[in-house]
Amino acid sequence: MFALNCRFQIAAILILFVIGVDYVQNPHLKLRSSKFFKLLLGSMALNLCLDMGTVYTITHMDSVSPSVNRLLHQFFIFSVIMVLFLTYLYIRMLADPQSRIRSKKIWVLMVPVGIAVLEIINGRLYYYNDGTSAYSYGPMVITVYACGFIYTVLGIRAAFHREGILSKKQKSSVVFGTILWFVILLVQMCFPYLLLSGLGFSLML
């Protein structure tokens, strides 16, 4: 059952591995955006590891303590939200490489993350396991959908914020990638047993 529920995560790991190898083999200028992309790749890799960890705990609830199961889910949900936030910052960095975000604005942009963290710490989380599919649901999970919508909109807005920085092709790629991930998120919301978030991140790149 564990392997069956990890099929999309395995596909995501393979895609991320190919992207990582391609990135390493091709020379890049030592730009802020290049370093940030490495951070983004690392965050996605960690997210996928946590994703597979939660699949294991929820499919082995008879041998894994409830506190460990909840804690791992909390880390996983937080990692999803942080990848969303970092993706938005990366898009903004590409669109306006010369400017730096002021600390006050960073705090404003992190308000959704802060609210999500409060819910992750104190919120309710439920588990479903029918022997074939397994997933978590509840108010804690809803924070992912809310942050996904917010940072998708902000990412698209950032891509079109300044004329002449990103080409039309680059803007189209940003819009396509972010909308693709959001569509996958909507599919995940309607069919929670599919566990598509990690695959969505990999395809978005």
Placement of each model-derived feature along the sequence:
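Extracellular-loop-to-transmembrane junctions of the mid-late helices
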Residues: F2-I13, A116-R157, I184, Q188-S197
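Membrane-interfacial segments
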Residues: H28, T57, D62, A95-S99, ...
